[in-house]
């Protein structure tokens, strides 16, 4: 049985009507009437605790609570709630407990007690020492249960469950119905002896273990590892092993990856333009008779109101009854477009009296605000007040604005632009709903930047790599520190398995590399501690055998730790299994080989008019041919069916081999089609060179050097390195050499040495030895360098000529191979040509021309002759049809082979030896060819082999047990013997290693089962044993009249494609090109830096001083001292800047005057 988790059972009640299984983390309810058999059972009724709270007293400061009433409580909206008192319980008294209730939507169930006459408003007075459980709906009681206090001496718990609205008092079921409704509110009304603990719960499925009808253990199906395992297998008892599982848990997290960091949204700006109504008439008397024009009403959005025509009008301020009137509008029409907000807005213009026109329009409700403008209008507008209706006033322009406050409408002068900033918060290592660059899906996101950044994936502004289904496989996000790569994995791993060791759930095996996992063989292991995942733990010590569960060479212990299984050497084996040992060759080094393979995938179709082919235009022949029946139709149906099958299979072939999408990478302007070879490309390293300062201050001289020159340069490095010139000389092939370049310091040194040696004759002659030695060493350097240059020149010329010759051979051989491919197409036409040539054969007739036969002979004789032509030509067509059928079968088989080659060689890497080329497959590139495909296979083939002793297996004879045999696991390799030790190695590559438990399969016996195949003879179908086939055939042949055409004159050839010789020729050319590699003698470039002479430095100093003086003089003469006074520090300039500067100003009267102003400090 799996280990029971912490915080398990704290209370277990199995009473008369119901039972509950209660813990601090969940409560399990089940009907006592339902007694399942012993064992594990999957049921509903489990409720996991989601919230726990407590309450000490809700009766306030009064002496007690009021019995018989419902008071207090809290809103829960949950599947279940449990309200429990302390273990001692509460007395049925107003000083301790009064009422507990649960509200199921419109139904309320409660328990209370009330012994006071007239003081029990809900239940009425009860008998002494009794309690009441009631249910009430819409204020009316419809269920009453009176129970003696003797059964429930104290109140301990009141629990309500949504399943059939079940209510439990002290663990007993006291109310239920046929409805299932969540609990909306609940509470306990009490005074003392608290606290009351409230447990709010949600419903989950559970697996319960029953003994004699009572739940002894419960496992929640809550998504935990233990719950997933137990509820999927309907048991809590597991033996050691691996258990596949699925986890379809609810995805709660979402995230979005935006393509842009920010998005600008430009809104539409609606423009309303108003103009002057030139044809408007003066208004009649009364404000209601003022006519409006150009009414514009804004709906929602952004608006611009254009009142440009008002520039010729004069705004009239509000002056009691005269002019404008807009106290509710804090803006003018000139500022209405300054980003004002409205809930509704309507604008119109009118023409009315300036005297009272605006004010009365606002008072009468025609507008919220009114703006008056004068344009010098006539005195023709009637008044709007009761005493002025017949008076004439000056007409003016009135602008009505009707508005209400809000945010639906905003005014603007330009289309508004709102910038939305997007932030990518990517959720890792959990199943999420994602929206990545507009593609929506669900997946498990992992960060693969460390493994992908070095290969420059998506370097050319790409966003994502899609898989064959079109879903995102890898995507990239630009961050502050560069590109981050993420991989989208499926949420559900079909290979995930729980690991049970020692009866305990200890870990998970999955194919997904999650954080904290460790690699075991081809899977990743995640340890589980206390029901949760934990981080990676290193593999502990090795063991000789594993009494628990093992995976390959790893042993998984009950504590979740991992040990490596290293079995002891088999000291008890008597002999190799079956006493069979043999020497085998196993390759240990390989060469890259390129193999060309041509496969024909289509055939040329043919259509022949059978009747025209047989008889031509002869009517006599056509009449005679009618006696042959539908032979032409049958033959043509065969040819046509071959063509139709060819078309159908060809379409299926190309549709099945065409990839779902073309991901063409661009790698430095190199197109590789569908094949991504970015993993093979490396980033070129930046060349090393001298610093910019050295190249600027020194003149460099380059000369051809020897390999010893680098050591010379390192030896002479430093400020006084020239003094060690002769000391740093090197030898090359026994000769002393020095670089031929001599600097000025060296020249001075050696010249002084030579002059000093000649000063006193023989006494100082030895001083010339350094001069002579260095001169001879430099002459040796020049001679050796010239000889190496000549040798390298000869090698380059010879290798180049050899390479040109091999390239010519290669082009010639490739041309021949392609010519043979083209011959396949040409020979298809040759078959048709041969068929047409059969028209010239007479097939035993007097002529091959039907018209000529009918001219020379009478009708009966001519028909007999033409009958021979018809029979011969039908035979020729039959051969053509048979040839096409045979060709279709062969091409169909070739297409199947091509499909396998594309799927296994092009789209993947084949594991079959020599199926994709010769040797182990690496890469295949397909190319189009006439009527087929050419595959270019890149493989590696063995170059050298190791001769080892191979062993089938071992026969082991333990001391106190029966013998058994061990053999290698299929696919792991073979057992070999090396220096009296035994190892296992792969069959196709020599890699010997120690034998582990995961490499062997145990057989029950050391004996082999031999199977022999008996020879079985099928009896003849003729009962007579004296049946002679030759005799029967001769009888049939003699009795049959026959006359066959001369088939020797008919020649039919099936073309066979053979480019083996040309491929071998290409391989010889490749070897020749490899042999033409040039191995040059190593030369080096000697770069010597020579310092400039002293007079150059003196000229640079003079030029710098002159430049500074000229710059100071310019500042001095122009008066632009500004910031220069404190920068240059020139004394005359400082004294000049200390005075007041002057400037000249030219006035309109062309009088030039001089003005002075104080100096401004900077």
From Swiss-Prot:
* Residue numbers spanned by region Heptad repeat 2 (HR2): 1024-1105
Q: Tell me which stretches of the chain form a coiled coil.
A: 822-866, 1055-1083
Tell me the Gene3D superfamilies matching this sequence: 1.20.5.300
Species this chain originates from: Avian infectious bronchitis virus (strain KB8523)
Gene name, please? S
Transmembrane regions listed in the UniProt entry: 1096-1116
The UniProt entry, under Pfam families, shows:
CoV_S1_C, CoV_S2, CoV_S2_C
Phylogenetic placement of the source organism? Viruses, Riboviria, Orthornavirae, Pisuviricota, Pisoniviricetes
SUPFAM superfamilies the record matches: Coronavirus S2 glycoprotein
Describe its assembly: Homotrimer; each monomer consists of a S1 and a S2 subunit. The resulting peplomers protrude from the virus surface as spikes.
Which ranges sit in the Cytoplasmic compartment? 1117-1162
HAMAP family the UniProt entry points to: GAMMA_CORONA_SPIKE (MF_04098)
Q: Which residues lie on this side of the membrane: Extracellular?
A: 19-1095
Q: Which residues form the signal peptide?
A: 1-18
- Write down what this protein is called: Spike glycoprotein
Biological process annotations from GO:
endocytosis involved in viral entry into host cell; fusion of virus membrane with host endosome membrane; fusion of virus membrane with host plasma membrane; receptor-mediated virion attachment to host cell
Instruction: Extract the ranges annotated as region (Heptad repeat 1 (HR1)).
Output: 769-874
Q: Which domain of life is it from?
A: Viruses
Modifications after synthesis and translation: Specific enzymatic cleavages in vivo yield mature proteins. The precursor is processed into S1 and S2 by host cell furin or furin-like protease to yield the mature S1 and S2 proteins. The cleavage site between S1 and S2 requires the optimal sequence [KR]-X-[KR]-R. Additionally, a second cleavage leads to the release of a fusion peptide after viral attachment to host cell receptor.
Domain statement: The di-lysine motif confers endoplasmic reticulum localization for type I membrane proteins.
**Carbohydrate-modified residues:** 51, 77, 103, 144, 163, 178, 212, 237, 247, 264, 271, 276, 306, 425, 447, 513, 530, 579, 591, 669, 676, 714, 947, 960, 979, 1014, 1051, 1058, 1074
């Amino acid at each position: 049985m799996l280990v029971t988790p912490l915080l398990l059972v704290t209370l277990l009640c199995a009473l008369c009507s119901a039972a509950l299984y209660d813990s601090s983390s969940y409560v399990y309810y089940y009907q006592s009437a339902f007694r399942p058999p012993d064992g594990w059972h999957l049921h509903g009724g489990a409720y996991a605790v989601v919230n726990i709270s407590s309450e000490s007293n809700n009766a306030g400061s009064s002496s007690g609570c009021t019995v018989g009433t419902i008071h207090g409580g809290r809103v829960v909206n949950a599947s279940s709630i449990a309200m429990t008192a302390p273990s001692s319980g509460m007395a049925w008294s107003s000083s301790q407990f009064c009422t507990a209730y649960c509200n199921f939507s419109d139904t309320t169930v409660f328990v209370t007690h009330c012994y006071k006459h007239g003081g029990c408003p809900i239940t009425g007075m009860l008998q002494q020492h009794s309690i009441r459980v009631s249910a009430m709906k819409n204020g009316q009681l419809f269920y009453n249960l009176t129970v003696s206090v003797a059964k429930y001496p104290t109140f301990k718990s009141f629990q309500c469950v949504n399943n059939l609205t079940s209510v439990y008092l002290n663990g007993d079921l006291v109310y239920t119905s046929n409805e299932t409704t969540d609990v909306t509110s609940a509470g306990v009304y009490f005074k003392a002896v608290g606290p009351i603990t409230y447990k709010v719960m949600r419903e989950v499925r559970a697996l319960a273990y029953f003994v004699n009808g009572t739940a002894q253990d419960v496992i929640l199906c809550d998504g935990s590892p233990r719950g997933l395992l137990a509820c999927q297998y309907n048991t809590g008892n597991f033996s050691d092993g691996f258990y596949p599982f699925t986890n379809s848990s609810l995805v709660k997290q979402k995230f979005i990856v935006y393509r842009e960091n920010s998005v600008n949204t430009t809104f539409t700006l609606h423009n309303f333009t108003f103009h002057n109504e030139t044809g408007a008439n003066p208004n009649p008397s009364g404000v209601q008779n003022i006519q409006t024009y150009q009414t514009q009403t804004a709906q929602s959005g952004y608006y611009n109101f254009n009142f440009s025509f008002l520039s010729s009008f004069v705004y009239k301020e509000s002056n009691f009854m005269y002019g404008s009137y807009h106290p509710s509008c804090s803006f003018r029409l000139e500022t209405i477009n300054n980003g004002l907000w409205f809930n509704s807005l309507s604008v119109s213009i009118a023409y009315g009296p300036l005297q009272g026109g605006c004010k009365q329009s606002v008072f009468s409700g025609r507008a919220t605000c009114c703006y008056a403008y004068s344009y010098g209008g006539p005195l023709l507008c009637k008044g709007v007040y009761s005493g002025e209706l017949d008076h004439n006033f000056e007409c003016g322009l009135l602008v009505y604005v009707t508005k209400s406050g809000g945010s639906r409408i905003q005014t603007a002068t330009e289309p508004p632009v709102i910038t939305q900033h997007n932030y990518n918060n990517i959720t890792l290592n959990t199943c999420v709903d994602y929206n990545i660059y507009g593609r929506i899906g669900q997946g498990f996101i992992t960060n693969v930047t460390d493994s992908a950044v070095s290969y420059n994936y998506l370097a050319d502004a790409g966003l994502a790599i899609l898989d064959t289904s079109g879903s995102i496989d890898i995507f990239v996000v630009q961050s502050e520190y560069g590109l981050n790569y993420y991989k989208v994995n499926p949420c559900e791993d079909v290979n995930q398995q729980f690991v049970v060791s020692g009866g305990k759930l200890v870990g998970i095996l999955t194919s997904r590399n999650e954080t904290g996992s460790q690699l075991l063989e081809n899977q990743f292991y995640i340890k589980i501690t206390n029901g949760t995942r934990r981080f990676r733990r290193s593999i502990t010590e090795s063991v000789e055998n594993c009494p628990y569960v093992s995976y390959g060479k790893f042993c998984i212990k009950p504590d979740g730790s991992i040990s490596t299984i290293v079995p002891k050497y088999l000291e008890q084996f008597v002999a190799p299994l079956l006493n069979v040992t043999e020497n085998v060759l196993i390759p240990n080094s390989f060469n890259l080989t390129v193999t060309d393979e041509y496969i024909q995938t289509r055939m040329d179709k043919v259509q022949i008019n059978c009747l025209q082919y047989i008889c031509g235009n002869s009517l006599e022949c056509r009449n005679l041919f009618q006696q042959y029946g539908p032979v032409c139709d049958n033959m043509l149906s065969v040819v046509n069916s071959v063509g139709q099958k060819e078309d159908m299979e060809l379409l299926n072939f190309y549709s099945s081999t065409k990839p779902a999408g073309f991901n063409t990478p661009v790698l430095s302007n190199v197109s590789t089609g569908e094949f991504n070879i970015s993993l093979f490309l490396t980033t070129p390293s930046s060349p090393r060179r001298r610093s910019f300062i050295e190249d600027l201050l020194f003149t460099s001289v380059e000369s051809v050097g020897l390999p010893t020159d680098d050591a010379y340069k390192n030896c002479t490095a430093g400020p006084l390195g020239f003094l060690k010139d002769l000391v740093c000389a090197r030898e090359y092939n026994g000769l002393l050499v020095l670089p031929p370049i001599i600097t000025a310091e060296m020249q001075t040194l050696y010249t002084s040495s030579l002059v000093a040696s000649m000063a006193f004759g023989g006494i100082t002659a030895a001083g010339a030895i350094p001069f002579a030695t260095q001169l001879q060493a430099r002459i040796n350097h020049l001679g050796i360098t010239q000889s190496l240059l000549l040798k390298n020149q000869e090698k380059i010329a010879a290798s180049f000529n050899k390479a040109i010759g091999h390239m010519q051979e290669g082009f010639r051989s490739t041309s021949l191979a392609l010519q043979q491919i083209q011959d396949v197409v040409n020979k298809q036409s040759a078959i048709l040509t041969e068929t047409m040539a059969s028209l010239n054969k007479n097939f035993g007739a007097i002529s091959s021309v039907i018209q000529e036969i009918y001219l020379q002979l009478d009708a009966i004789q001519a028909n007999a002759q033409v009958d021979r032509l018809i029979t011969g030509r039908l035979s020729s067509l039959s051969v053509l049809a048979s040839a096409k059928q045979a060709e279709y079968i062969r091409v169909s088989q070739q297409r199947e082979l091509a499909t396998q080659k594309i799927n296994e060689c092009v789209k993947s890497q084949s594991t079959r030896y020599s199926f994709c080329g010769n040797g182990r497959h690496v890469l295949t590139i397909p190319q189009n060819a006439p009527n087929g495909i050419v595959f270019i296979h890149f493989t590696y083939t063995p170059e050298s082999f190791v001769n080892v002793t191979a062993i089938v297996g071992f026969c082991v004879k333990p001391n106190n047990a029966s013998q058994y045999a061990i053999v290698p696991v299929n696919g792991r390799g073979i057992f070999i013997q090396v220096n009296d030790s035994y190892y296992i190695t792969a069959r196709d590559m020599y890699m010997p290693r120690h034998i582990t438990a995961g490499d062997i399969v145990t057989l029950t016996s050391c004996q082999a089962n031999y199977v022999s195949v008996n020879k079985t003879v099928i009896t003849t179908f003729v009962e007579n044993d004296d049946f002679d086939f030759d005799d029967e055939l001769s009888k049939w042949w003699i009795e049959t009249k026959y006359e066959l055409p001369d088939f020797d004159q008919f020649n039919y050839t099936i073309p066979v494609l053979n480019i083996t010789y040309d491929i071998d020729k290409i391989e010889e050319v490749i070897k020749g090109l490899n042999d033409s590699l040039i191995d040059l003698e190593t030369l080096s470039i000697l770069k010597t830096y020579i310092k400039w002479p002293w007079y150059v430095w003196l000229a640079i100093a003079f030029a710098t001083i002159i430049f500074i003086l000229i710059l100071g003089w310019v500042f001095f003469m122009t008066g632009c001292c500004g910031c220069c006074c404190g920068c240059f520090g020139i004394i005359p300039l400082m004294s000049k800047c200390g005075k007041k500067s002057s400037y000249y100003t030219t006035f309109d009267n062309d009088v030039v005057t001089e003005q002075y102003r104080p100096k401004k400090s900077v």
